[in-house]
């Protein structure tokens, strides 16, 4: 797996708050394995569906947390974190929303709707509207 540092993240998301200096870029297959674990965990906790008290920012934060836990499990890692974060942005419809973001390498970024969880495409306007990012 490739690695990046805070500089790569801040080029894409200048407002990003990074808790680590170095990150491992996961593969799509690895992220999709977390999709399955996340869905199982949310079902067990009875919070898979959207609720006013467990909404998009809670789900995005939970998915980011689970990726960090799974990434750190097997053995000592070469980097401090995994390149999965959460972003808040304004949708094309005008409302705020929180989802996840993953760096697959230093320039390839994909978004995740954690309420699926499923891969998500942001419009150009939505991408530019990101006002918070945390890794």
State where each predicted segment sits.
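A structural boundary/capping signal
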Residues: 1-135
């Amino acid at each position: 797996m490739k690695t990046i540092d805070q500089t790569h993240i801040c080029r894409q998301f200048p407002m990003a708050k990074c808790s680590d200096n170095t990150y491992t870029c996961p593969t799509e297959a690895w992220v999709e394995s977390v999709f399955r674990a996340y869905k199982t965990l949310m079902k067990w906790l009875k919070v898979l569906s959207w609720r006013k008290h467990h909404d998009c920012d809670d789900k995005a934060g939970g998915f980011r947390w689970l990726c960090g836990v799974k990434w750190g499990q097997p053995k000592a890692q070469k980097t401090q974190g995994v390149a999965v974060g959460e972003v808040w942005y304004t949708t094309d419809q005008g409302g705020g929303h929180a989802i996840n973001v993953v760096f697959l390498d230093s320039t390839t970024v994909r978004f995740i709707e954690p309420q699926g969880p499923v891969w998500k495409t942001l419009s150009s306007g939505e991408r530019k509207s990101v006002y918070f990012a945390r890794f």
